Amino acid sequence: MDLPEPIRRRLGDFSRTVFVDQSRTQPSFEEHANFLDQNKDVVSSLPLQMSLYFNMWFFPFWWISEVVMLDLKYSALADYYKFILITILIVMTLIEAIRLYLGNAGNLQEKVPELAGFWLLTFLLQFPLILFQLFNEAVLVQPLERGVHIILALFIFAEVLFGFVALRTMVRHTESRFHLRQFHGIQELRT
């Protein structure tokens, strides 16, 4: 549901007044007109950004608890599970850093390729890996591990959902801007 146009205009004017740096020299009229263009809607997703933010702060705690629990149960694990869990820890650490960067860049800068990369890494790699660690009882899941895995799985699940919605919204917005530019070019040719 969209806001009525007068309220939307007033909120836009208010946000420009509050968030535009007024301390520097005044820009030229052209810069001002380009910067304050009324037709530019923000399509980044606040729920996705909040999930990414809290995930970024939770991940070091998850990583430390995972390393401590892996050290405690290492001698009781089968050899192939030792290799699998260490590999999963390394892969998840690398993927998480890349994934959080792509998610932030794609969402805040409204870049579709970065957001699509974030969503694919989340859905195809992180989600199955965390579910493997959460539900495979052969890896001797400890209570602390189960707790932090559940929290991380909830973050990842929320990011899959919010990322899909944000990606769909961003693609539709980009597509409509493309068609409007194309239509504007046709109108200029006619005149």
Swiss-Prot record:
**Membrane topology listed for this record:** Multi-pass membrane protein
**Family (UniProt):** Belongs to the TMEM17 family.
**Highest taxon, organism lineage:** Eukaryota
**In its UniProt entry, what is this protein called?**
Transmembrane protein 17B
Function description = Transmembrane component of the tectonic-like complex, a complex localized at the transition zone of primary cilia and acting as a barrier that prevents diffusion of transmembrane proteins between the cilia and plasma membranes. Required for ciliogenesis and sonic hedgehog/SHH signaling.
Tell me where in or outside the cell this protein is found: Cell projection, Cilium membrane
Transmembrane helix as a keyword? yes
Q: What is the lineage of its organism?
A: Eukaryota, Metazoa, Chordata, Craniata, Vertebrata
What InterPro entries does its record include? Uncharacterised_TM-17
Record keywords: Cell membrane, Cell projection, Cilium, Cilium biogenesis/degradation, Membrane, Transmembrane, Transmembrane helix
Identify the Pfam families for this entry. Transmemb_17 (PF09799)
Record note on quaternary structure: Part of the tectonic-like complex (also named B9 complex).
Q: Which residues cross the membrane?
A: 50-70, 83-103, 115-135, 147-167
User: One of this protein's GO BP terms?
Assistant: smoothened signaling pathway
GO CC terms on record?
Answer: ciliary membrane; ciliary transition zone; MKS complex
Please give the organism.
Danio rerio
